[in-house]
Amino acid sequence: MTIGIGLLGLGTVGAGVAQILASPEGRHPLVGALSLRRVAVRDLQRPRPVTLAPEIIGDDPAAVVADPTVDIVVEVIGGLEPARSLILAAIAAGKPVVTANKAVIARHGAEIAAAAAERGVYVLMEAAVGGGIPIIEPLKQSLGANRIERVSGIINGTTNYILSRSEEHTSELQSPDHLVCRLLLEKK
């Protein structure tokens, strides 16, 4: 059985996903059962770091979500809209969603989770939090009977970067706010 994947976004993360799907050799056996059926991009003329069949690439993300050959929607376009609307449309169509979009999960995560629960589909977001560490599903499934009172640690790559750099560059003349702003700009 082949599972059709619809990919929303073909930037750095999307191109990486497409590359994995295009060359599953040496990867988990289930990757071979996945087929990239449709890809939506903002700019059809922009050069891409991965070569895909031209007939699967388009600039209409809603068409990717609605395509009956797409079984799972992977959203890596970032930002709040149209990401939120596309995720909700996929859920309404009964399609599981995988997202690496921190912004949409932070702002609309409760709404998305409620829609997914109501429709009975998965929304996987490990790629958006904790540096891709598979922590969300184990917390939801395996530890449901436990009462977790606190999770502590550096669970975000940006936070880790800021803490590491601030330790190296802190001086009495710099305010913490100034340092954080400078480091965030430096990281971009």
Predicted regions and their residues:
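Rossmann-like NAD(P)H-binding beta-loop-alpha module
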Residues: R119-G120, L124-E167, S171
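Short glycine-rich anion-binding loops that position phosphate/pyrophosphate groups of nucleotides
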Residues: L44, G78-L80, A103, A128, ...
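Rossmann-fold NAD(P)-binding glycine/threonine-rich loop
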Residues: A83-A89, K102-G131, I136-L139
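Positively charged, low-complexity/disordered segments
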Residues: E172-K188
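Structural motif
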Residues: L8, E75-I77, A100, R107, ...
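A short hydrophobic/small-residue beta-strand
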Residues: P96-V98
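Short acidic, glycine/serine/threonine-rich loops at helix termini
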Residues: A18-Q19, P49-L52, G109-I112, P134-Q141, ...
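N-terminal glycine-/serine-/threonine-rich beta1-alpha1-beta2 phosphate-ribose binding loop
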Residues: M1-A93
